[in-house]
């Protein structure tokens, strides 16, 4: 006996996948930034130096005196001479009052008053350097600085994000198929 035969014919299913990849685009605009630096305030004050040279005493030693000094000295000398003259006159008067004592007061007074007085010439032709007085006050510098902070203004911008989601498209390119045929054996004529 012959058994029928099964003939199976199958076609595999085919799936087509079409993918669109996801797209992500990010852009970061730069922030707007303004920086302003105000100038610092600077104040400078200078007190100038002072040099004082006093050579009055050196000139006086050379007998080059100021007119006011000469007037003062002449007045002082006149006062001293008047006082000496008064003292001399009083002394001579006292001598004349005592004329009865031995001596000749009139002749001795005449001799004394007729004597030449010696005049002293200045001996210093060059003054000493110590007579020149020098005084120096150094200058002073005062610097005041007031710093100023920078003014910063920043305006950030949000990022620009463009997102396109991906997509998968599924297509059946070929559907599966299964055909089963039964094949009966052919009977042989010999029977």
From Swiss-Prot:
Entry-linked InterPro entries: DUF6470
Induction remarks: Transcriptionally regulated by SigD.
Organism whose genome encodes this protein: Bacillus subtilis (strain 168)
UniProt name for this protein: Uncharacterized protein YviE
């Amino acid at each position: 006996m012959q058994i029928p035969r099964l003939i199976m014919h199958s076609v595999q299913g085919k799936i087509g996948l079409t993918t669109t990849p996801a797209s992500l685009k990010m852009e970061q605009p730069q922030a707007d930034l303004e920086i302003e630096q105000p100038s610092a305030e600077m104040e400078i004050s200078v007190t100038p130096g002072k040099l004082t040279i006093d050579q009055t005493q050196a000139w006086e030693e050379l007998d080059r005196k100021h007119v006011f000094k000469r007037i003062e000295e002449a007045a002082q000398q006149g006062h001293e001479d008047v006082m000496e003259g008064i003292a001399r006159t009083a002394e001579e008067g006292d001598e004349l009052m005592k004329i009865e004592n031995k001596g000749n007061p009139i002749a001795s007074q005449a001799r004394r008053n007729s004597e030449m007085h010696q005049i002293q010439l200045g001996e210093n032709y060059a003054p000493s350097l110590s007579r020149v007085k020098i005084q120096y006050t150094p200058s002073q510098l005062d610097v005041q600085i007031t710093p100023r902070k920078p003014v910063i203004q920043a305006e950030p911008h949000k990022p620009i994000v463009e997102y396109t989601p991906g997509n998968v498209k599924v297509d059946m390119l070929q559907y599966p198929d299964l055909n089963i045929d039964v094949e009966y054996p052919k009977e042989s004529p010999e029977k």
